[in-house]
């Protein structure tokens, strides 16, 4: 039996002992947050956030901004994360908001911090278990680009106190543009089966669940970038006939050659196979309530999976003047000179990890008088063997909107500035962002919460979490004889030899840390409708095992995240208003920048620069829900925030002696808007027919670390019509981006070293970056039987 498996079963035994010692307790219970409820500040879920309306994805939950850079979207099912780490096993590859779920909501930041040790909102979902009789739900969704999505759940009883539930999810999504390498940009299938036994006259409920997923999220790399002309005033215009969002920027060829990080062997694969994710999960859940109201819930899940993330990251986009003898394969198979104006270099990243994880959570809770207390325990074990192989290649940048082609260096055998292997297409294997780690991470935590109505006017909610984190394994952060990190070089792998004679071998790592989280919230009613509210959450963390993937060790100091909010609320029969001031900061963020510099020879050199930095954000949020007349609902959310970098400094020396330096301390954090507005009106035309819209405004965002480039504010818009035909059938039509906005968002590839004073000279230049999801019409139907 593998060592990793032995570790998992040992952890399972420890978890069982801990369960017996602590008597367990209740998973975060589903509570629908009502903005009209005075106690909503202390419910575990947020309301009015439309978490599944996502302008970046057709089938995944959106990220809710909290003033910090993008991080993992936390998604829970039955109270535990659906995946321990989203690289390499992404949420969308094994979880969808489909017919297999009985509930999808959004946990508050404080609840997420106490129960998981993470910061941010979390999607909160529960599996649809068997009910009496025979029940079924069939959901169907399509769009005008040809997406076909099916979701089916069947459940019922098979004998006294025995219940079943089975679900199937199938997604065939070609995306918003055709690519030559595969007919689908998302091909995902998910199967679930649950068997439930109720016992002791219904007081207890024991459930076993099997979950299988197989997913090819091609969109991960297919929609990663596109070329555009940066005008210089925050706007962009289309490059030639390349339509953003509806034209493919991927080369026609699906092949990828790489050097295996573990063995050094040069291998060939195709991108569709490289991005495959598959997993098998086994879950046991128990829920028991004693006659005195004491409730015990426990869940344990074993996950055996292969996770994969593939990126085709745009690096430099330069004019075709570097003196390279580029050829391309024409339609007839002949090699012809490339005479296009531009050349796009890309870095292919093939990330794959083999995962065994065990998660155990148990909670004990009871409502006693005017308070509810909860005691919980997490035992989470994560074992992974992970590597990321990188390959550089060049492609054409066609102005006519045709498919790009890979470019071949006819002089590759004698070309001095790059290291080719076998042919003139692929070069500099594993030189830039290649990664490796193998080991396990274990977290065991004890937490409690207390929700207490002290008086009719005062409610207090507080909790704490104490977590022990252990990390063991190997990575490839190798030092030479002088004690300096070797870094990555061309043809890097475990067993290679660096230029200074250093042998590349796995480096052991072993860490033990204590983390904790504290939260407190208070609501005081000055009148029956008006009151004061405030909350504070403080969480400490340490690096996770994936932070040890690069060529240097991360900063292992404590990461601290304090979040405080205070304000007022007002409720009456037709209006609910909350207005809060907030502060959030985060210390010791670990990151690695791939800095680019054009040498005197005209070649673009890429160097990795690790750094550690802090962030702080001041903000003000006002949330309004109103019902001015029958059938009409209106939600308005306004947020102003000012996220800034603290201690953001790094530098790297390129081969020609040029020192690339970044000092972004005091700058606005890249890609985060300072103003966010959400407007959500809806109207019931009849009791069965609803029309609705959702507008989201994001103000100007900076597109590089130095705040030199920026994109103007943009609207994300949704609208739809929902018709409840009868108690069995519901139909819907949704329009995404009905204002038909086009343009860029996010960051600009290769722009990290550009300073503000130099940005003007790049006006009118062709660049590459991410873009807004195009106009899309979606159709849906839901049949219950």
Where do the language-model regions lie?
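Outer-membrane beta-barrel translocator/receptor signature
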Residues: 86, 99-105, 112-193, 199-206, ...
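Acidic/polar loop-and-plug regions of large Gram-negative outer-membrane beta-barrel proteins
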Residues: 183, 196, 205-283, 308-350, ...
